[in-house]
Amino acid sequence: MLRYIYATDLNDHPKLARTMFRDRADQFKFRLGWNVSVDDVGFERDEYDELNPLYVIWEEPDGSHGGSMRFLPTTGRTMVNEHFINILSGPITSPFIWECTRFCLNRGVGRHVAAALMLGGGEVMQNFSVEHFVGVFDARMIRIYRIIGAS
């Protein structure tokens, strides 16, 4: 099931939140080898999780995380403007452009989860009048984005 949850509401879904942040640690720190912090309970979280982002999350039948993405409007703080400004010609700031980061899949899920998350991104665009998403991603993701038609 696809869920749309703001960070302030994650406490209403403790298993989903717990498994999402653990899956993020597994994917970004251990599988991809990114320089991200993992806390004592095994969660990968950063300062952008404190800004009340909108998460699009695939919830498995047992209530656990299958996959997720994090969205923030570029009218506020974003990772791309604060950490990757060197690859831009200037800051991206528009109510019609949102940042999408932390695209994460649980190791055991099927391709339908990635496709559902892309559908969720389309629904975010429709429901919030978003025209574009911006994000910086690992080059290995290009193949996945092409498979699901999002490149």
Model-based region annotation:
Residues 63-68, 98:
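Glycine-rich phosphate/pyrophosphate-binding loop shared by adenosine-nucleotide-utilizing enzymes
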